[in-house]
């Protein structure tokens, strides 16, 4: 799987939970309180790449937005994609990349989490990410 070449590791998975409005919930076993780049993987293929969008958003916070259908329409759309896969008997795994280093450009801190999102989407072409 190409994700491992970039340093992604598996940290959890999505599960069906009919009592929730979204119909899905998640289990995380690592990186819950970290700010990361994440990917949803079905059949060893990255289907979606996203980020914890600001400096205080953790992985658990971000996954909760899909689970609770909070915020942008993207959260509902992706939750429905996850639910559809699970209903067809597929597993939807959660992988993360936590950049270790901090870069600077002329004295400015460079946000590697946000900075890696678009290049990864361009390289991996995950079908759930809206492109172009």
Language model regions located:
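GIY-YIG nuclease catalytic motif and its immediate N-terminal context
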Residues: 1-57
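Short flexible/disordered coil segments
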Residues: 19-21, 76-80, 108-116
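Solvent-exposed, flexible loop/coil residues
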Residues: 20, 24, 63, 132
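Structure-specific nucleic-acid interaction/processing domains
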Residues: 87-132
């Amino acid at each position: 799987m190409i994700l491992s070449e970039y340093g992604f590791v598996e940290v959890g998975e999505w599960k069906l939970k009919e009592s929730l409005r979204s119909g899905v919930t998640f289990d995380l076993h690592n990186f819950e309180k970290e700010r990361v780049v994440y990917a949803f993987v079905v059949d060893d293929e990255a289907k979606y790449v996203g980020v914890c969008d600001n400096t205080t958003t953790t992985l658990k916070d971000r996954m909760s937005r899909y689970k609770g259908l909070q915020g942008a329409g993207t959260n509902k759309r992706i939750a429905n994609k996850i639910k559809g896969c699970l209903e067809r008997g597929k597993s939807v795994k959660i992988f993360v990349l936590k950049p270790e280093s901090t870069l600077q450009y002329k004295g400015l801190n460079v946000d590697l989490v946000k900075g890696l999102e678009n290049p990864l989407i361009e390289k991996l072409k995950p079908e759930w990410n809206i492109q172009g």
